[in-house]
Swiss-Prot record:
Compartment list: Cytoplasm
Cofactor: Mg(2+)
Name of encoding gene: MAP3K8
Name listed for the protein in its UniProt record: Mitogen-activated protein kinase kinase kinase 8
Major subcellular location class: cytoplasm
Keywords: ATP-binding, Cell cycle, Cytoplasm, Immunity, Kinase, Magnesium, Metal-binding, Nucleotide-binding, Phosphoprotein, Proto-oncogene, Serine/threonine-protein kinase, Transferase
Gene Ontology terms for molecular function: ATP binding; magnesium ion binding; MAP kinase kinase kinase activity; protein serine kinase activity; protein serine/threonine kinase activity
Tissue expr: Expressed in several normal tissues and human tumor-derived cell lines.
KW Kinase (keyword) present: yes
UniProt PTM: Autophosphorylated. Isoform 1 undergoes phosphorylation mainly on Ser residues, and isoform 2 on both Ser and Thr residues. Phosphorylated on Thr-290; the phosphorylation is necessary but not sufficient for full kinase activity in vitro and for the dissociation of isoform 1 from NFKB1, leading to its degradation. Phosphorylated on Ser-400 by IKBKB; the phosphorylation is required for LPS-stimulated activation of the MAPK/ERK pathway in macrophages.
Active-site residues (renumbered): D253 (proton acceptor)
GO cellular component, one term: cytosol
Residue ranges the record marks as coiled coil: none
Residues the record lists as Phosphothreonine modifications: T80, T290
Organism whose genome encodes this protein: Homo sapiens (Human)
Length: 467
């Protein structure tokens, strides 16, 4: 697909130039202009550690062939972030057939919610893995999002009873970038990585589980989200993006399926396409992301920055408020298998913004979808936008289970001050019916109502109803 055209008056000159080009000279020039190595992602100390691990690859392979133990592949143990990155580098740089006959699993763990036994961490005996389809849309279970580049299971450590998400990646598709960002950068709105374990020819990544599922699952099961729900989600996503962007990290795949609900927050997941820039502009060697949420500058492959994530968030906001991704209603997938050219020529998709969108939210979406990335606001700027900070009286009382219980407690306290000492005395309380009602208000009944609201809460963003 062409995005540039050459004038016809220059065509003859170009044809003549091509005829006299020496292909080998062109290749030499391009190799000098574009180094084959990926730009450095982390601080020199971490990169030096990873490079040292790479230098030992040949020795490790010879040890594997001879049947001797390799330090990185001998057991499952607790370690540091540096240990995990070295482990990831080692297994990604070693041919997968070296792992097929491994007698036992190996890996590096960062959190003690995972409990290996004598250097082992075995399925069924140490950890249970439940296919995500068995829990999907099951009211009594956790929702677990499906990863773009691997299957995701619900996992539970048998000893600690900790529930986790477990992403399975074939070793030949595994890349160090699958763990680097989550391992090196911790934030409340980024799903925490607990560790990586290699079983046979499959890498298992254990991380924080989304109790409420993904935004995409919420949309598929409940339809378009209400604006106060969108505000709640957007603020959490922007906090995560603000942190990542301050570290010059581009997520590259912001979309509903990569935003996951916890009981009191939303977190970002799936950092397999993420990179940390070493300059102000990142020049990719390939397209990164999901095309329907891609910004025009990403599609052009001429360099982009963290502002690409802001555009993707704007496209995600349209999906949340309408229940449908941008472009799809006007350009059905059956007729348009690819949206790259449409986005390049027609972005931004302002016509897809919901008709009932408030003026403030419309302004925020339009700013996020600004075609020129230099005019696009930063995550920190959007967090201050009035659309995300409505007056207190307009904010729904639905922040968390704790706030729901606190609200009920305050209500009961006020009621208790108004009650006579003996609420059973009909002369004081009026009717027996009123007395029974007051007794119920002072009982656990109200708290159970709040808990019922909590079960609604963990299946998606907070709702207005609490019982």
């Amino acid at each position: 697909m062409e995005y540039m055209s050459t004038g016809s008056d220059n065509k003859e000159e170009i044809d003549l130039l091509i005829k006299h080009l020496n292909v080998s000279d062109v290749i030499d020039i391009m190799e000098n202009l574009y180094a084959s190595e990926e730009p450095a992602v982390y601080e020199p100390s971490l990169m030096t550690m990873c490079q040292d691990s790479n230098q030992n690859d040949e020795r490790s392979k010879s040890l594997l062939l001879s049947g001797q133990e390799v330090p990185w592949l001998s057991s499952v143990r607790y370690g540091t972030v540096e240990d995990l990155l070295a482990f990831a580098n080692h297994i990604s740089n070693t041919a997968k057939h070296f792992y097929g006959q491994r007698p036992q699993e190996s890996g590096i763990l960062l959190n003690m919610v995972i409990t290996p036994q004598n250097g082992r961490y075995q399925i069924d005996s140490d950890v249970l893995l439940i296919p995500w389809k068995l829990t999907y849309r099951n009211i009594g279970s956790d929702f677990i999002p499906r990863g773009a580049f691997g299957k995701v299971y619900l996992a539970q450590d048998i000893k600690t009873k900790k529930r986790m998400a477990c992403k399975l990646i074939p070793v030949d598709q595994f890349k160090p970038s699958d763990v680097e960002i989550q391992a090196c950068f911790r934030h409340e709105n980024i799903a925490e990585l607990y560790g990586a374990v290699l079983w046979g020819e499959t890498v298992h990544l254990f991380m924080e589980a989304g109790e409420g599922g993904s935004v995409l699952e919420k949309l598929e099961s409940c339809g378009p989200m209400r604006e106060f729900e969108i505000i709640w989600v957007t603020k959490h996503v922007l906090k995560g993006l603000d942190f990542l962007h301050s570290k010059k990290v581009i997520h590259h795949d912001i979309k509903p399926s990569n935003i996951v609900f916890m009981s009191t927050k939303a977190v970002l997941v799936d950092f397999g396409l993420s990179v940390q820039m070493t300059e102000d502009v990142y020049f990719p060697k390939d397209l990164r992301g999901t095309e329907i949420y891609m910004s025009p500058e990403v599609i052009l492959c001429r360099g982009h920055s963290t502002k690409a994530d802001i555009y993707s968030l704007g496209a995600t906001l349209i999906h949340m408020q309408t229940g449908t991704p941008p472009w799809v209603k006007r350009y059905p997938r059956s007729a348009y298998p690819s949206y790259l050219y449409i986005i390049h020529k027609q972005a931004p998709p302002l016509e897809d913004i919901a008709d009932d969108c408030s003026p403030g939210m419309r302004e925020l979406i339009e700013a996020s979808l600004e075609r020129n990335p230099n005019h696009r606001p930063r995550a920190a700027d959007l967090l201050k936008h009035e659309a995300l900070n409505p007056p207190r009286e307009d904010q729904p009382r639905c922040q968390s289970l704790d706030s729901a219980l606190l609200e009920r407690k305050r209500l009961l306290s006020r009621k208790e001050l108004e009650l006579p000492e003996n609420i059973a005395d009909s002369s004081c309380t009026g009717s027996t019916e009123e007395s029974e009602m007051l007794k119920r208000q002072r009982s656990l009944y109200i708290d159970l109502g709040a808990l019922a609201g909590y079960f609604n809460l963990v299946r998606g963003p907070p709702t207005l109803e609490y019982g």
